[in-house]
């Protein structure tokens, strides 16, 4: 398996807000997701491909992310598993992605997040029922 640099993905729901996404917009600046993955720096498409997913933890994080931006359909099983090479995400409207390097996956949960973000609970490996 080829090496993929760690990134974090910042989603600004305001940039893709509509009437259907008012709930997402109310969360302010969005949130961060860390894990090893490759994806376009900027995507203005309704289909987004996440590739080289390497860990079940990322699958759990992405399941929050999918619902947060109101994606309507996944191509492939969800949450992602180690054996799944990629997933195509079909969303209701185009979404802008802003990608920066993440210093270390282990520190992802301590990066600054919106307090109301669904991912504002360390770490991603905890069960979904243990949100604070």
From Swiss-Prot:
Highest taxon of the lineage: Eukaryota
Region Disordered, annotated ranges: 113-132
UniProt miscellaneous comment: Partially overlaps YLR415C.
Protein name: Putative uncharacterized protein YLR416C
Organism this protein belongs to: Saccharomyces cerevisiae (strain ATCC 204508 / S288c)
